[in-house]
């Protein structure tokens, strides 16, 4: 980015998102949807391997208003209207092995340590990641930044949105994650799920 004003604004946004008050990896997290029994996640690569694991237990970060979370606020959790079950997920950050994705380098390094070749690109090998980590957390900063540089991806003048561009580089961006969230690949010690009252709409 050549414009000094754009660079200055970008640096200010990144600094704000790195502030301790913006930390999104907090306990408790929120899980929406019925939980009948907590079992060990069976993490697999999807039929079309990519940025998302299959079989993970997903949680979202609660928001300051106390009634919503990052999944609900993003509009991605369409089940919440018909399945109001909501749980708080308590964990010990000092015990759980959680890799944080705050930057493009964080995401690229995770893939480089656990690569799976798919159609000429390296994508995350989720069973391999699950052997090393209990969870992967995507922060707000990571949601914005964990994508391959535009210079690494062939230009497609027919694509206006940039999504396909993000997915066609030497490694995929995190666009499929959609929002700030945590993918639990294993259940660590000191992990507890408690039912909470449904969110009032």
Question: Where are these predicted regions, by residue range?
Answer:
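Extended catalytic/binding region for NAD+/ADP-ribose chemistry, centered on the ART fold
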Residues: 38-82, 88
């Amino acid at each position: 980015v050549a414009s000094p004003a754009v660079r200055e604004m970008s640096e200010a946004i990144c600094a704000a998102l790195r502030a301790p008050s913006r930390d999104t990896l907090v306990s408790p997290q929120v899980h929406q949807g019925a939980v009948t029994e907590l079992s060990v996640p069976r993490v697999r690569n999807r039929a079309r391997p990519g940025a998302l694991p299959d079989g993970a237990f997903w949680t979202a970060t609660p928001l300051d208003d106390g009634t919503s979370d990052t999944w609900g606020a993003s509009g991605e959790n369409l089940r919440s209207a018909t399945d109001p079950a909501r749980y708080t997920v308590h964990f010990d950050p000092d015990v759980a092995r959680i890799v944080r994705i705050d930057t493009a380098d964080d995401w690229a390094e995770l893939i480089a340590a656990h690569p799976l070749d798919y159609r000429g690109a390296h994508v995350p090998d989720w069973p391999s990641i699950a052997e090393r980590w209990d969870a992967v957390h995507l922060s707000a900063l990571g949601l914005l930044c964990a994508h391959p540089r535009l210079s690494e991806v062939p230009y497609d003048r027919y694509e206006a949105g940039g999504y396909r561009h993000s997915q066609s580089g030497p490694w995929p961006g995190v666009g499929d994650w959609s929002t700030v969230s945590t993918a639990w690949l294993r259940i660590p010690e000191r992990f507890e799920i408690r039912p909470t009252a449904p969110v009032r709409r």
